[in-house]
Amino acid sequence: MRSWAGDATTRLRAVSAPQFRTDLHLADRVLDLSRPVLMGIVNANPDSFSDPGHRSLEVQLDQVRSMVAEGAGIVDVGGQSAITDVAEIDPAEETDRVLPLVEAIRAELPDVVISVDTYKPVVARAVLAAGAHIVNDVSGLRAPELAPLVAEYRAALVVMHTAAPPKVRLQASDLYDDVVADVRDFLSAKVTEAIAAGVGKRSILIDPGPDFTKTPAQTVEVLRRLRDLNPSGLPVLLALSRKDFIGALTQTRPTDRLAGTLAAVAAVGSGSGVVLRVHDVGEVRNFLTVLEALTATDPVDADLRLTDDLRWAT
């Protein structure tokens, strides 16, 4: 692996994270995105690389409680893994996995914004009827019924770039003539489609789809040029956490990619108009807290102190 320092002609660029529109309109509220909002990942499936194995509803709900306490403003509930070598499940089974958790969150934590990671209209209708606020569609609106359904419930929609159907692994260095232009044009067309179906423009987030039908180099190029692929300045969902492009750069497994995740957050995910989809809510929150303190111009509270119980043991 190349030395992190590079060669003598290489210099670190000044980090200036992109800034995008700072309001996201949901059916019952407007979400303030003037600072990055953390979306905690909650897997209601046994196939996820981060949370393998069956977990009871109470265990899942306890994870939601912990993420909210750590600073998550949104929880993203998923019932089907995006892993390509795991078979797709039918909509009824996916609904059975996610609906009880959505209902439990709404009942116990009504202030929490609920996103559901699905591209299936049957699942989306069930969770929207139960009170979910956002449909996180990783298919790029392949189901024509999905956008009108989101509009019917006045919910928000995540439009993600991908060049293949769900569960299809496609990575090739020559797949795109210009990956940034292709992602920009795809997202622009899909946003237009969603608006035509009745979804409010202020209820749409775009997702450049890191790793989805992109090589690590293509993902890095897309993230470097995030401003270029979002000329309208729509809010952006960034799913950077533990991604394969980070693993390729650092040659690490998913569970060892926190440092790389934080570096990606600093570079492209620390500005306004951003939702960060993350596994490690507390760590990302702490990182952003320190980053903001060190880069802001506002004075730090003069009375700020560390409590004795948090000091190094003597």
Feature-to-residue mapping (PLM):
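Active-site-adjacent loop and "lid" segments of alpha/beta metabolic enzymes
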Residues: 2-8, 17-19, 26, 33, ...
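Catalytic domains of carbohydrate-active enzymes, especially glycoside hydrolases
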Residues: 62-78, 271
